[in-house]
Amino acid sequence: MTIMTMIMKMAPSKSALIRFNLVLLGFSFLLYTAIFFHPSSSVYFSSGASFVGCSFRDCTPKVVRGVKMQELVEENEINKKDLLTASNQTKLEAPSFMEEILTRGLGKTKIGMVNMEECDLTNWKRYGETVHIHFERVSKLFKWQDLFPEWIDEEEETEVPTCPEIPMPDFESLEKLDLVVVKLPCNYPEEGWRREVLRLQVNLVAANLAAKKGKTDWRWKSKVLFWSKCQPMIEIFRCDDLEKREADWWLYRPEVVRLQQRLSLPVGSCNLALPLWAPQGVDKVYDLTKIEAETKRPKREAYVTVLHSSESYVCGAITLAQSLLQTNTKRDLILLHDDSISITKLRALAAAGWKLRRIIRIRNPLAEKDSYNEYNYSKFRLWQLTDYDKVIFIDADIIVLRNLDLLFHFPQMSATGNDVWIYNSGIMVIEPSNCTFTTIMSQRSEIVSYNGGDQGYLNEIFVWWHRLPRRVNFLKNFWSNTTKERNIKNNLFAAEPPQVYAVHYLGWKPWLCYRDYDCNYDVDEQLVYASDAAHVRWWKVHDSMDDALQKFCRLTKKRRTEINWERRKARLRGSTDYHWKINVTDPRRRRSYLIG
């Protein structure tokens, strides 16, 4: 009897213990699920940040190029007074979908309001507690070229590149936010509206809030609601993350890890996104073995080039593929081509290593008929390669000398500088997206390319970009045309082992010259592109190819006639570099005919 009584007394205790264990097990399962499905930010999305010498979080010098800090302070004081004296506030009505996007949970809903000081937010209180996000606005004296200078000392020979400060809110003082609402400046259609620093600042404030203080769903996405006539910057807020659009309201659900990666990089091209050389000097390359050892391949990636309208770059594309394979890359090589490339040459391109994909050309509606750049917008087809998460585009007049796989760790748009705040589109890191392709195509009749080609156009679409070292896409030119510049660059072209990652051949291409010397020397207007050292480097790659591929680099009779005519003119005008005196031994000087 005593034993039965004890068992009966213990039964409720065991039942309670079992219930407690089940609850604990369920909680542990939920926690494990959340961790398991959290996208890894250590390899694909954020590994690029480990190379940054001065990131968005750290670049805070006291002087903006040519602008005294005192002037900025005074200007910002004026901005504050303007805000305080704003008498007529705009009554801001919420979008119709406001209720459905707010997830009600424990505690009061918190809504962060950015750049809303001049708005009447009375009606918003029914949705939750509105929190004004305070930050100091950039001065009107702060110009785009301060963030995107034409030149920086990449090798740090005389100075260490730094970026001017863009003020941000005090994030540590803020609580978690259920929603970030942003009033985005839009000065369209004023000239230069895309490169307004305040526009960039507000986009960055929104991105930082979403990444650092935004509550996330099970997909680790936060919510950002923009109010603007202009679309938020697609360089920061991808159009793929646009969930709803209603009048001037834009609802985004960005992936937090993607935002974190972008925010880890310098705020402009004022510093390198990828410093390849150690502080000891340009000859000491960073040891990347640890990064490469830790790197997995969670995404599909490829190198891509494009051929269209003629076969004049077939030889260049063959040589490019061979140079990439010599770097031991394991990424796919994709070649986009139109119907202008013959079957014979397509077979040669495939034999060189390219996987072929046919495209339909895209015409620039503002180009003159039959002009050289009439179909240069065909390059936009790159964004339709959506079976790849990331691609690196490389022009067919480039050879690669060192492995470039590291660039896959960097976001769109990463490239090398060209002129002023413009990047060079010869090598670009791209994230394919049908949505982005549609955005690019939709503005063809509106955007006027400064150079009539894809480079000028893309620089108006992606104005916020990340500077890669010029040695990643080393241009074969000598703009100052000084002996010092020529000596430095020619030494880099000839260095063994290679000190540049890729050489971009401007002017007459190597396969359109005799192999004996760079034929740019024969034309006065082309002298800025002339380099025998770079010429020899290209032919070294060519000579390593199979004979069956080399024959596609033969000269046409027409081109041979042009070369001989230019040599004759150089002799008649007494060109003092005397390249016209060089005895031509190139066997292609006789066997000059078209293949296929």
From Swiss-Prot:
SUPFAM superfamilies reported for this sequence: Nucleotide-diphospho-sugar transferases
Keywords: Cell wall biogenesis/degradation, Glycosyltransferase, Golgi apparatus, Manganese, Membrane, Metal-binding, Signal-anchor, Transferase, Transmembrane, Transmembrane helix
InterPro entries hit by this protein: Glyco_trans_8, GNT1/Glycosyltrans_8, Nucleotide-diphossugar_trans
Needed cofactors: Mn(2+)
Gene that encodes it: GUX2
Subcellular localization: Golgi apparatus membrane
Chain positions of site Important for catalytic activity: 379
Protein name: UDP-glucuronate:xylan alpha-glucuronosyltransferase 2
Pfam family, one: Glyco_transf_8
Transmembrane spans: 17-37
Binding sites annotated in the UniProt record for Mn(2+): 395, 397, 504
Keyword Metal-binding: yes
Keyword GTP-binding: no
Residues reported in the UniProt entry to bind substrate: 395-397, 424-426, 451-455, 504-509
Catalytic activity, EC: 2.4.1.-
GO cellular component: Golgi apparatus; Golgi membrane
Gene null: resulting phenotype: No visible phenotype under normal growth conditions, but mutant plants show reduced xylan substitution.
Top-level taxon of the source organism: Eukaryota
Biological-process GO terms, alphabetical: cell wall organization; glucuronoxylan biosynthetic process; plant-type secondary cell wall biogenesis; xylan biosynthetic process
Molecular function per GO: glucuronosyltransferase activity; glucuronoxylan glucuronosyltransferase activity; glycosyltransferase activity; metal ion binding
Membrane-protein topology: Single-pass type II membrane protein
Protein role: Glycosyltransferase required for the addition of both glucuronic acid and 4-O-methylglucuronic acid branches to xylan in stem cell walls. In association with GUX1, is responsible for almost all of the substitutions of the xylan backbone in stem glucuronoxylan.
Family the entry assigns: Belongs to the glycosyltransferase 8 family. Glycogenin subfamily.
